[in-house]
Amino acid sequence: MAFNRRSKNITQGVSRSPNRSMYYAMGYEKADFDKPMVGIANGHSTITPCNSGLQKLADIAIKTIKDAGGNPQVFGTPTISDGMSMGTEGMKYSLISREVIADCIETAVNGQWMDGVLVIGGCDKNMPGGMIAMLRTNVPSIYVYGGTIKPGHWKGKDLTIVSAFEAVGEFTAGRMSQEDFDGIERNACPSSGSCGGMYTANTMSSSFEALGLALPYSSTMANPDDEKVGSAAESARVLIEAIKKDLKPRDIVTRKAIENAVAVIMATGGSTNAVLHFLAIAHAAEIDWTIDDFERMRKKVPVICDLKPSGKYVATDLHKAGGIPQVMKVLLDAGLLHGDCMTITGQTVAEALAHIPSVPSADQDVIHTIDKALYAQGHLAILKGNLSPEGCVAKITGLKNPVITGPARVFDDEYSAMDAIMANQIKAGDVLVMRYLGPKGGPGMPEMLAPTSALVGQGLGESVGLITDGRFSGGTWGMVVGHVSPEAFVGGTIGLVEEGDSVTIDARQLLIQLNVSEEEIARRRANWKQPAPRYTRGVLAKYAALASTASKGAVTG
């Protein structure tokens, strides 16, 4: 049986002689034209430690695909470092890079008639961008995550990149010495690999394991470790078998599979960005999945992993404790996973987990049993109210003050808000309203890790609320609400809030409310005028023109 189902369109027949000439220039032989053409979307980059260790994974995938009878075709995908661009205009390109990555992979795979694709990525948007492309093209595919960074250390404490962000607030508030500030900066990131807590990169990679399009244990391996190279090689072998069986992403990514992925996100305390990305992933798969489905899942899936940012441990600790397979086994036995979902290996979820113990090891405290869950319900809540009738996203577990009503401190950009925080002008009880930062208004929904971390560092993480139509980093915690929809730029109520207005965030009632009369809101709405777009040319302008509302994933098509 021929396995070059697609690539034969570009390699076979008399009319394709010029095509073959170009392949011969790259060392191909005649027999190679009967083999599958397998794309390797390589996200290697020296921009960020998240991606600086990916080339070795691409190299082993190339060798393995050749050895298994395929023709590897390598092409690059871009990346943006969320951590480095945070707090700058560059952060506006982060979410946009999700769309660019998806478009790049779709363009290469379909333009070159590839028979399958292995996607390698590291930083946050690499994962959803790659998955969206895999689902759009729907050729046999597998995701190879670059792996997590190892924790840093300073004076006996484990560090992550969030430690450095929070140190900024502590230092400016006079709560940290210069020695400790410099020590944390120098030691927070000790190796290659993606940010080490259950932040966005590790959240998305973990969910891809649960989804069935990444190999077991692959999402919690550290990039510097040899097992990560071994996992990449095995991923390439599995992909060749999937090509032979014509097992495609849309055979695997069903509504039930998305429920499995979201269950793992809830159980591990994952990033708010997962809400946005899975709306986009479902859209690419043409699956009916809405923002309200996250709330439905939250109510039935407990948090069973004690992981940063709100918990104690990092991804390497989770790996030692049994990784995502152990988390999934606990959920499966509790009836919280669909065991009949297919995975890229050809096994069902239940078959893949058959050898995993039902009870996590007693010599670890990372993964809990259901009866000893950290929180009885999930942490990613969908709040609604007159400030966000389409819904917005908040992390609500572990809050000492689940309800806050306070005066609005209104900022139309991130930088003025950050200046106010650094000048100690924000006080306990305030509710920061940061707006015109949505998909169209930002544009690009920049993340607010810099201001939220500064608040935490100043000791205000539990006593100040923050509302935005932008996003939050996976490293954010506290009384923060993002993805407010409709956004300010299209006339959402968040754009009508005035300085000093009373605003309520109620995590118990899942309510977000501007405490102003309907008549007053109507008056303000009648007087509101849409501001001029911040960008009129280039990729930011393109995204602003095309992006959907955050409640539908901020997708472009």
From Swiss-Prot:
Pathway(s) this gene product operates in, as recorded in its UniProt entry: Amino-acid biosynthesis; L-isoleucine biosynthesis; L-isoleucine from 2-oxobutanoate: step 3/4; Amino-acid biosynthesis; L-valine biosynthesis; L-valine from pyruvate: step 3/4
Residues annotated for [2Fe-2S] cluster binding in this entry: C50, C123, C195
Requisite cofactors: [2Fe-2S] cluster; Mg(2+)
Catalyzed reaction equations: (2R)-2,3-dihydroxy-3-methylbutanoate = 3-methyl-2-oxobutanoate + H2O; (2R,3R)-2,3-dihydroxy-3-methylpentanoate = (S)-3-methyl-2-oxopentanoate + H2O
Active site: S473
Record keyword Kinase present: no
GO biological process, one term: isoleucine biosynthetic process
Protein name as catalogued: Dihydroxy-acid dehydratase
